[in-house]
């Protein structure tokens, strides 16, 4: 009798624990089996999705020695991208001024240059090169040609070729053509979260990776650099320039995911507008600071006025006009210097002000979407455009975890980036990520896809989301056990557990009903069949295996930044499996 009572107590204890474990799983998540999928032979996979990609009959064998023709307007970083492409197949290049018989020819040029590649390329769709960052790429019977709107656009064409070369078997490539462009001018991420700052290596690695997906902006606004804000008037020391600024500028220029250096001159020791002499003196201080980083390699700057006192529309307009004119004066001496000037307004949480219409045309107006945790929606972008006379530069506070640091936010594509938004009413989109730079790539990949070619449906967004994990994990099109495990884990690490200020993100969607039904039976003490037990045991086992798989073979940098969550999966699944099996017995 005592033994039976003890057994019943142990079973009741087990039921309480498994109720807790399943409740935890509903909150944290669970995974189903994760077989590696094989891509169907439907063509080359390129992300972001090109606007147009077509295939012609046939293919050809590329030669190991290729002949390359570069036009004068192609910069060294774009040439380096082609060398990287060729290295994927162990191919070597010699450079000449025209096509050579007996070799695969690769031609890289700029539209409208009237040089060799421009004249040889042939026709393209009307209006293609009126679009942002547009390029045409074609592979045709032994010749690969890339024609860009400028050298950056040619770089994007070569980046598409990079992803195609990764899928080429041997050296046999299909005949195809791509015509492509960006929907949004500025695409990237901003280091503006509250939390542990990224290291210089984190920042460089993220820019390098972003360059493979046609991102063009790493917006520098970290909380750990006093010379960005509190001491914005002070120049950097030589050591700071060499260890902090130059490496970031170099990584940004090489990847074309440029290091956008921002100053916040409106919060501490602010620009003075109380006299002409004071204003001119402060303007020179700000220009000297920007000039220092431009000399160190920075090729785009930005100005912030958020969370500070409002100095008035006329004063903002004057400063932005003066800075725009100054950039125009500098540009001839600094190749690649961007005239585009992002500006974060004091009213960044609002819906726009009419005085923004007075800003110079090159100024991009940074807004968060009508609230702090705003979203890219037609409602906001259309309303703002009607008021300001131009589209907003969207600062989206996702997937940042400022108010939920115990969480990883590994999803939310269509919640924050709505399908079908009019691209003509958006000038930029940057995401504010988590303090964990590497897992933030899942969301950043979504922005890369969206800002280049805005998805029209949830299905398109889901396709990008499911594809993201292989590109996040190993920058390639092939599914691996590790990337599949990361995807399955991530589907259950999405909800940010915040208040009504932010739209709730759902996780564990595919398993929620099953888990809740099991939890109800455990709680009520209802009979659970062996099949139901085995089903839940399988789910926990697959989850356990996913964690172990990623720990064993996943990306080292990602693993190091999500190790506490992997540990949590291990502990939870061990406890849950032991108790479930105990109850079943």
Which residues does each predicted region cover?
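Sec-dependent signal peptide cleavage junction
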Residues: 30-42
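Catalytic-core regions of glycoside hydrolase
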Residues: 166, 193, 308-462
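Acidic, contiguous N-terminal accessory segments
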Residues: 23, 40-141, 169-178
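Bacterial N-terminal signal peptides
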Residues: 22-32
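Short, Lys/Arg-enriched N-terminal segments with co-localized hydrophobic residues
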Residues: 1-11
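C-terminal functional modules
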Residues: 456-585
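Conserved, mostly hydrophobic/aromatic
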Residues: 68, 150, 189, 210, ...
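Feature activates predominantly on carbohydrate-active enzymes
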Residues: 124-289, 296-299
């Amino acid at each position: 009798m005592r033994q039976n009572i003890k057994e019943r107590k142990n079973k009741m204890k087990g039921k309480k624990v498994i109720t807790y474990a399943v409740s935890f799983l509903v909150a944290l998540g669970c995974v189903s089996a994760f077989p590696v999928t094989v891509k169907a032979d439907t063509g080359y996979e390129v992300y972001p999705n090109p606007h147009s990609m077509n295939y012609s009959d046939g293919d050809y064998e590329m030669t190991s020695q290729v002949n390359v023709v570069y036009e004068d307007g192609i910069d060294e970083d774009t040439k380096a991208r082609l060398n990287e492409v060729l290295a994927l197949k162990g191919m070597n290049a010699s450079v000449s001024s025209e096509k050579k018989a007996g070799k695969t020819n690769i031609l890289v040029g700029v539209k409208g240059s009237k040089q060799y590649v421009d004249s040889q390329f042939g026709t393209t769709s009307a209006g293609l090169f009126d679009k942002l960052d547009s390029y045409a790429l074609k592979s045709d019977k032994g010749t690969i040609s890339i024609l860009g709107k400028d050298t950056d656009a040619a770089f994007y064409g070569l980046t598409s070729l990079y992803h195609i070369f990764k899928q080429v078997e041997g050296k046999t490539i299909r005949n195809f053509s791509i015509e492509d462009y960006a929907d949004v001018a500025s695409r990237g991420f901003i280091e503006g979260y509250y939390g542990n700052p990224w290291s210089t290596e984190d920042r460089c690695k993220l820019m390098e990776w972003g360059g493979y997906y046609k991102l063009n902006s790493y917006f520098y606004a970290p909380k750990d650099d006093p010379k960005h804000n509190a001491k914005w008037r002070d120049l950097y020391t030589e050591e700071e320039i060499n260890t902090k600024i130059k490496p970031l500028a170099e990584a940004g220029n090489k990847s074309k995911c440029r290091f956008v250096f921002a100053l916040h001159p409106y919060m501490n020791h602010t620009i003075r507008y109380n006299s002409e002499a004071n204003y001119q003196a402060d303007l020179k201080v700000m220009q000297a600071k920007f000039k220092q980083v431009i000399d160190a390699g920075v090729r785009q700057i930005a100005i912030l006025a958020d969370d500070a006192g409002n100095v008035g529309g006329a004063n903002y307009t004057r400063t932005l006009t003066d800075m725009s004119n100054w950039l125009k004066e500098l540009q001839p001496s600094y190749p690649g210097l961007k005239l585009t000037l992002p500006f974060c307004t004091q009213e960044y949480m609002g819906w726009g002000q009419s005085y923004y219409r007075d800003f110079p045309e090159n100024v991009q107006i940074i807004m968060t979407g009508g609230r702090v945790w705003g979203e890219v929606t037609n409602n906001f972008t259309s309303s703002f455009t009607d008021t300001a006379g131009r589209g907003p530069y969207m600062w989206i506070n996702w997937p940042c975890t400022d108010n939920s640091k115990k969480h990883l936010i590994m999803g939310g594509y269509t919640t924050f980036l709505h399908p079908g938004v009019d691209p003509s009413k958006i000038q930029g989109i940057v995401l504010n990520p988590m303090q964990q730079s590497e897992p933030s790539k899942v969301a950043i990949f979504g922005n890369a896809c969206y800002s280049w070619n805005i998805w029209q449906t949830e299905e398109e967004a889901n396709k990008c989301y499911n594809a993201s994990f292989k590109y996040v994990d190993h920058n390639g099109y092939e599914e691996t056990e590790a990337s599949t495990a990361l995807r399955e884990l991530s589907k259950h690490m999405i909800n940010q557990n915040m208040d009504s200020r932010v739209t709730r993100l759902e996780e564990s969607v595919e398993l929620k009903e099953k888990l809740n039904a099991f939890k109800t039976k455990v709680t009520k003490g209802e009979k659970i069949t062996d099949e139901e037990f085995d089903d839940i045991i399988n789910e926990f086992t697959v989850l356990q295996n996913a964690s172990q798989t990623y720990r064993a073979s996943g990306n080292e940098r990602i693993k190091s930044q999500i190790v506490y969550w992997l540990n949590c999966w291990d502990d939870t699944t061990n406890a849950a499996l032991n108790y479930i099996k105990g109850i079943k017995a």
